[in-house]
Amino acid sequence: MTKIAIIDYGMGNLRSVQKGFEKVGFEAVVTADPKVVLEAEKIVLPGVGAFRDCMRNLEQGGFVEPILRVIREGRPFLGICVGMQLLLTDSVEFGLYQGLNVIPGHVLRFPEGMREGGEELKVPHMGWNQLSIKRRPPAFAEVEDGANVYFVHSYYEMPDDESVIAATCTYGVEFCAAIWKDNIVATQFHPEKSQAVGLSILKNFGEMK
């Protein structure tokens, strides 16, 4: 049985996520086969690009039902960047598009004209920023409040239930930077690009039962 399956649906630099797991001692398999996902102990859904394209590719690749099934069965599941956004109900990126609706909520665009310290904030939000820890999932055991992590995104999550928010970040607005619900942990930031902090998340996820 594959221990960690990284879903390859044509969206994102999956090799960097795979290398992140390798650095902390875990073998992760990049797969475009839904059957491998169904057989895996832990599942990772990365994602870079437009929400609608990511969702379409998941559907065309036959991944939607396997993802919903492994989540229902309680297997550890990690969503990264757009992979986190896809877990919500819908996104307003390029229209209104339905997501997996595992976490009720919406994906919104950063408002225009945001300012901080007298300077206009550019969209996308790109670079290092601080986390404010609200709840600490097992994968965040070594993530300190105020830890710096790496973001690249123009849209952010707004879960209906604030109790699922594990961490927030502020960029013009305070937004949800990480989600934790049961067996699901998801990050808007890229743990594979977040140096020691991010690698600790991958390591602790790999150790989840």
UniProtKB/Swiss-Prot annotation:
Taxonomic lineage is:
Bacteria, Pseudomonadati, Thermodesulfobacteriota, Desulfuromonadia, Geobacterales
Major place of residence? cytoplasm
Which is one Gene Ontology cellular component term of this protein?
cytoplasm
Q: Name one Pfam family in it.
A: GATase
Q: Which residues form the active site?
A: 81 (nucleophile), 190, 192
Q: What does this protein do?
A: IGPS catalyzes the conversion of PRFAR and glutamine to IGP, AICAR and glutamate. The HisH subunit catalyzes the hydrolysis of glutamine to glutamate and ammonia as part of the synthesis of IGP and AICAR. The resulting ammonia molecule is channeled to the active site of HisF.
Reactions catalysed, semicolon-separated, are: 5-[(5-phospho-1-deoxy-D-ribulos-1-ylimino)methylamino]-1-(5-phospho-beta-D-ribosyl)imidazole-4-carboxamide + L-glutamine = D-erythro-1-(imidazol-4-yl)glycerol 3-phosphate + 5-amino-1-(5-phospho-beta-D-ribosyl)imidazole-4-carboxamide + L-glutamate + H(+); L-glutamine + H2O = L-glutamate + NH4(+)
Gene Ontology biological-process annotations? L-histidine biosynthetic process
Q: Does the keyword NADP apply?
A: no
The compartments listed are: Cytoplasm
Q: Superkingdom of this entry's organism? A: Bacteria
Pathway membership, UniProt:
Amino-acid biosynthesis; L-histidine biosynthesis; L-histidine from 5-phospho-alpha-D-ribose 1-diphosphate: step 5/9
Question: Which UniProt key words apply to this protein?
Answer: Amino-acid biosynthesis, Cytoplasm, Glutamine amidotransferase, Histidine biosynthesis, Hydrolase, Lyase
Q: Which CDD domains match?
A: GATase1_IGP_Synthase
Look up and give the organism this protein is from.
Geobacter sulfurreducens (strain ATCC 51573 / DSM 12127 / PCA)
Boundaries of every Glutamine amidotransferase type-1 domain copy = 3-209
Does the entry feature the keyword Lyase, yes or no?
A: yes
The gene it comes from is: hisH
- E.C. no: 4.3.2.10, 3.5.1.2
One of the entry's Gene Ontology molecular-function terms is: glutaminase activity
Q: What is this protein called?
A: Imidazole glycerol phosphate synthase subunit HisH
Report quaternary structure and partners.
Heterodimer of HisH and HisF.
